[in-house]
Amino acid sequence: MEVTFFGTSAGLPTKERNTQSIALNLEPYSNSIWLFDVGEGTQHQILRHSIKLGKIDHIFITHMHGDHIFGLPGLLTSRSFQGGENKPLTIIGPKGIQNYIETSLQLSESHLNYPITYIEINQQLAYHHNGFTVQAEMLNHGIPSFGYRIEAPITPGTINVEALRGIGLEPGPKYQEVKLQETFEYKGLIYNSDDFKGKAKPGPIISIFGDTKPCENEYELAKNSDLMIHEATYIEGDKKLANNYHHSHIDDVFNLIKQANVNKSLITHISNRYNIDEVTSIYNELSLDQTSPHFYFVKDFDTFKI
């Protein structure tokens, strides 16, 4: 799996940063792409990347502020002509997302050639798809804003060929049953599959946050994440200012990383008040502090393996 950032700015675009959008490539579990937020200009950013709109089969919206949704109507329309024909799309987000999209398409007389399934979140959501589990919880941003916890499928343990041969079962189609099922039958006997394969490997856990100031649900979403993607609109200065606007300060994110035992953290949604050089300087200063956790300020088009 890997994650690519198509927009990393907060509120307004800058010359270096587009507004928010994150792509999650599900390979090797699936050849699908999941998109988180679609700020204005997202489809133009995607044109500069190898990702194709037709491979996007889920879009998750964190909240209804414009820097997270203004790119939706154009991207959805273009998907019809860029490999998305007859390919179903699921859009998950706060209440109002369906009305926003359908009204935009209706008023612009835009027509799609694929079906959309809408799932609007009230307070929380548990969603399952092709072995993936997605948990959504309400954050604290002044309007409904959600964070998503994505747990990838468990990879079954490797088949122990010698152990299976020990009961007389040679390699063949039956091995797939041993690999995927809890028990299997052979010559009238029922066997426990775990006795004939190695330990299953849990898939990575990724937590992706919408805009928020610190709140209780953050911990539940972030705990033991292999990768956390979080906003830090304010990366220096007065923390009270960030929280007054229902946003996070970098110190808030650091506290969450430590409390939730996060392995790796990528920081996005950086205020347009900071240019690239200033972000680099602040990053270098924070990195020198030995109490700082593992983190990175992302830029547009950054891609990270998970």
From Swiss-Prot:
Cofactor, free-text remark: Binds 2 Zn(2+) ions.
Protein residues bound to Zn(2+) 1: 63, 65, 141, 211
Protein's name according to its UniProt entry: Ribonuclease Z
Record-level Gene Ontology MF annotations: 3'-tRNA processing endoribonuclease activity; zinc ion binding
Cofactor: Zn(2+)
Record's function text: Zinc phosphodiesterase, which displays some tRNA 3'-processing endonuclease activity. Probably involved in tRNA maturation, by removing a 3'-trailer from precursor tRNA.
Quaternary structure annotation from Swiss-Prot or TrEMBL: Homodimer.
Coiled coil: none
Active-site residues, as the UniProt record annotates them: 67
HAMAP family the record matches: RNase_Z_BN
Keywords, in A-Z order: Endonuclease, Hydrolase, Metal-binding, Nuclease, tRNA processing, Zinc
EC number: 3.1.26.11
Residues the record lists as binding Zn(2+) 2: 67-68, 211, 269
One Pfam entry name: Lactamase_B_2
SUPFAM superfamilies: Metallo-hydrolase/oxidoreductase (SSF56281)
Catalytic function, reaction form: Endonucleolytic cleavage of RNA, removing extra 3' nucleotides from tRNA precursor, generating 3' termini of tRNAs. A 3'-hydroxy group is left at the tRNA terminus and a 5'-phosphoryl group is left at the trailer molecule
EC class of the enzyme, as a word: hydrolase
InterPro entries listed in its UniProt record: Metallo-B-lactamas, RibonucZ/Hydroxyglut_hydro, RNase_Z/BN
Protein's UniProt keywords contain Metal-binding: yes
Family the entry assigns: Belongs to the RNase Z family.
